[in-house]
């Protein structure tokens, strides 16, 4: 199992993965045409000549035995108009805000059920930061993530059903799909500059506002461990929290090492597992393999070299795997 950038031939496999995802994964709607557009954006961004041309990257967890995608994570450039609510506790209201939290955001983190609790959730999430560090120029000083808010067992959002439905007349599933497929049209046609007093919201909505769905708690914990902090903003649809970090202070980037690799025999037992990525932003790969850092060199087996498509002596970025729980989904 390893991480690589998405390719056009991954469309069918990616669609099958997304089809099984719960409601609320706005950035990857169950629509093959839209998924194809996002894949092609990623392919084009991977080969972009400059950071200004970069729009999106989708990284997939690939199973070479089954020849299928078992997870996906992503980064994307935020639109200049990015609607969300700002929670104003002093005035006890929600204010619609369209100023981007940061120029780049995390998104599209989804791991199939069969590969949870095997360390792949951490690899899938952290690979985005390893990819960021591989780029020749920093995309943004800051980066943020919008986490999935509370959605009940019927895939309905109490936040939206209480607030949005009364204002705009669409149920959560329909409006969530519309935002994912036509974000600009969504902002223009479905949002008005209303201030929403807390008094219009019931106690359940107020209690859940800014809280993550149970399936997303581990993802939030992981981001907090990466030095992401909560903001005063929440998602426009489900009221989920929005967190932000300084790119250079992200723990995976700050604590990783850059060093050359050397091949050792399989008889050399390497007891620690490392998250390792190559330094090729235009042919990015990452894996979770046994390795040992000795005298400034990362000792690996031949399988690791083959997986990363590198030669002995090439430089890699690596970080020792921690034993913390990892999240499985956020948007």
Regions found by a protein language model. Name each.
Residues 2-14:
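A short beta-loop-alpha structural element at the N-terminal edge
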Residues 27-70, 74-82:
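Active-site rim helix/loop that mediates acceptor-substrate recognition in acyltransferases
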Residues 56, 69, 75-80, 138-295, ...:
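Extended, composition-driven regions rather than compact fold-specific motifs
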Residues 74-108, 173-184:
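Conserved acyl-donor/pantetheine-binding loop and adjacent beta-alpha core of acyl/acetyltransferases
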Residues 108-111, 116-132:
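Conserved acetyl-CoA-binding loop-helix of GNAT-fold acetyltransferases
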Residues 289-314:
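Short beta-strand-centered segments at strand-helix junctions
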Residues 316-318:
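A generic structural signal for residues embedded in beta-strands
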Residues 320-326:
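Short, charged beta-turn/beta-strand-edge "cap" motif at the junction between a beta-strand
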């Amino acid at each position: 199992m390893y991480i690589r950038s998405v390719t056009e031939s991954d469309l069918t496999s990616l669609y099958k993965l997304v089809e099984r995802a719960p409601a609320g994964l706005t950035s990857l709607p169950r629509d093959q045409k839209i998924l194809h557009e996002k894949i092609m954006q990623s392919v084009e961004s991977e080969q972009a000549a400059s950071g200004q041309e970069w729009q999106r990257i989708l990284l997939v967890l690939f199973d070479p035995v089954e020849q299928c995608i078992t997870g996906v994570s992503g980064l994307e450039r935020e639109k200049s108009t990015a609607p969300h609510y700002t929670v104003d506790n002093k005035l006890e209201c929600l204010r619609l805000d369209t100023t981007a939290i940061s120029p780049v955001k995390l998104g599209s983190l989804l791991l199939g059920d069969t590969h949870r609790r095997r360390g792949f959730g951490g690899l899938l999430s952290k690979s985005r930061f390893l990819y960021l560090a591989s780029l020749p120029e920093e995309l943004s000083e800051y980066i943020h993530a919008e986490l999935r808010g509370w959605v009940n067992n019927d895939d309905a959002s109490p936040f939206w059903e209480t607030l949005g439905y009364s204002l705009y007349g669409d149920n959560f599933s329909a409006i969530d799909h519309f935002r994912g497929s036509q974000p600009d049209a969504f902002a223009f046609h479905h949002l008005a500059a209303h201030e929403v007093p807390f008094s219009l919201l019931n106690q359940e909505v107020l209690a859940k506002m800014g809280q993550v769905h149970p399936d997303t708690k581990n993802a939030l914990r992981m981001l907090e461990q990466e030095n992401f902090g909560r903001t005063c903003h929440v998602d426009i649809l489900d009221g989920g929290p929005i967190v932000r970090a300084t790119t250079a202070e992200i723990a995976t980037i700050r604590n990783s090492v850059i060093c050359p690799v050397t091949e050792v025999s399989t008889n050399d037992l390497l007891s620690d597992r490392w998250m390792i990525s190559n330094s090729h932003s235009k042919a990015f790969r990452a894996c979770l393999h046994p390795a040992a850092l000795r005298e400034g060199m990362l000792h690996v087996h031949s399988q690791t070299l083959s997986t990363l498509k590198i030669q002995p002596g090439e430089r890699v970025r690596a970080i020792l795997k921690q034993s913390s729980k990892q999240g499985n989904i956020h948007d």
